[in-house]
Structure formats: structure tokens, C-alpha cells
């Protein structure tokens, strides 16, 4: 997940209200993201799931 070095034309801009980009990983396979998208608040990590969030509304 790149927050500040955007690679055109592939970046995503998040909509109002869900303006943080995030990626979700399973802790057992940290190299393979399970899900990515936009969210309003960065979720807390758990024993099974790790979240990586940007504090911007644009990301790759």
C-alpha cells in the first residue's frame, strides 16, 4: 500500500466519509493482502488480522 508515492494512472481516490485507504492481511500470510479499499476508521489489529492504513484518501 503506497500512501504518498502514487503511481499514475493506477491510484484510487476514496469517497467522502470513507476517506482512508486500507489493506487487510491475515497474520499467517502477511505478504498476501486479503482485502483493500476505503474505510472511515482504521480497524484495530487482532490475533488473526493485521490492517495497514493510510491517512490519505489517495493510494495505490
Curated annotation (Swiss-Prot):
Keyword Lipid metabolism: no
Top-level taxon of the source organism: Eukaryota
Keyword Disulfide bond listed: yes
Endpoints of the signal sequence: none
GO biological process, alphabetically ordered: killing of cells of another organism
Gene Ontology CC: one annotated term: extracellular region
SUPFAM superfamilies per the UniProt record, alphabetical: Snake toxin-like (SSF57302)
Recorded GO MF terms: toxin activity
Alphabetic keyword roster: Cardiotoxin, Cytolysis, Disulfide bond, Membrane, Secreted, Target cell membrane, Target membrane, Toxin
Tissues where this protein is expressed: Expressed by the venom gland.
InterPro entries recorded: Cytotoxin_Cobra, Snake_3FTx, Snake_toxin-like_sf, Snake_toxin_con_site, Toxin_cobra-type
First-listed, main subcellular location of the protein, grouped into a coarse class: secreted
Cysteines paired by S-S bonds: 3-21, 14-38, 42-53, 54-59
Cell compartment(s), UniProt: Secreted; Target cell membrane
Function: Shows cytolytic activity on many different cells by forming pore in lipid membranes. In vivo, increases heart rate or kills the animal by cardiac arrest. In addition, it binds to heparin with high affinity, interacts with Kv channel-interacting protein 1 (KCNIP1) in a calcium-independent manner, and binds to integrin alpha-V/beta-3 (ITGAV/ITGB3) with moderate affinity.
Self-association state and partner proteins as the record states: Monomer in solution; Homodimer and oligomer in the presence of negatively charged lipids forming a pore with a size ranging between 20 and 30 Angstroms.
Other observations noted: The sequence of the major component is shown, it is called toxin CM-8 and the minor component is called toxin CM-8A.
Family from the record: Belongs to the three-finger toxin family. Short-chain subfamily. Type IA cytotoxin sub-subfamily.
Record's protein name: Cytotoxin 3
Amino acid at each position: 500500500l503506497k500512501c504518498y508515492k502514487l503511481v499514475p494512472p493506477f491510484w484510487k481516490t476514496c469517497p467522502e466519509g470513507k476517506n482512508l485507504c486500507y489493506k487487510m492481511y491475515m497474520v499467517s500470510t502477511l505478504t498476501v493482502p486479503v482485502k483493500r479499499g476505503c474505510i472511515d476508521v482504521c480497524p484495530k489489529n487482532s490475533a488473526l488480522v493485521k490492517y495497514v492504513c493510510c491517512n490519505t484518501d489517495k493510494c495505490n
